[in-house]
């Protein structure tokens, strides 16, 4: 049985125009938990998708400031991970987790 912690680390795959462009370089983009570390992300991707990970780069996108009926609020921060796979490896993100 796969470790349930891995499903908590990887929230969802990112399917955008930019993420399909980086797939040419054997990379895949995921939304990950805000407190997830690079080793945790690497272990989760390797366990869930049965692939070998070469590198993990992370990005924290700060939440935007929004106003609703004069009240100022802020969206949540989002952490993204760009996972570089070893040569010959691939992940089909359209199938889901």
Curated annotation (Swiss-Prot):
Natural source organism: Bartonella henselae (strain ATCC 49882 / DSM 28221 / CCUG 30454 / Houston 1)
Keyword Ubl conjugation appears in the UniProt entry: no
Name this protein carries in UniProt: Large ribosomal subunit protein uL23
Gene: rplW
Keywords: Ribonucleoprotein, Ribosomal protein, RNA-binding, rRNA-binding
Assembly and interaction partners: Part of the 50S ribosomal subunit. Contacts protein L29, and trigger factor when it is bound to the ribosome.
Any single Gene Ontology cellular-component annotation: ribonucleoprotein complex
SUPFAM superfamilies recorded: Ribosomal proteins S24e, L23 and L15e
Gene Ontology biological process terms from the UniProt entry: translation
Taxonomic lineage of the native organism: Bacteria, Pseudomonadati, Pseudomonadota, Alphaproteobacteria, Hyphomicrobiales
Record carries keyword RNA-binding: yes
């Amino acid at each position: 049985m796969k470790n349930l912690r891995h499903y908590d680390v990887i929230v969802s795959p990112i399917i955008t125009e930019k993420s399909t462009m980086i797939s040419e370089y054997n990379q895949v983009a995921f939304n990950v938990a805000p407190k997830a570390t690079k080793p945790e992300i690497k272990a989760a991707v390797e366990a869930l998708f049965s692939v070998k990970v070469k590198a993990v780069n992370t990005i924290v996108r700060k939440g935007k400031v929004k106003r609703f009926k004069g009240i100022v609020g802020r969206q949540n921060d989002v952490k993204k991970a760009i996972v570089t796979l070893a040569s010959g490896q691939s992940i089909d993100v359209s199938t889901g987790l």
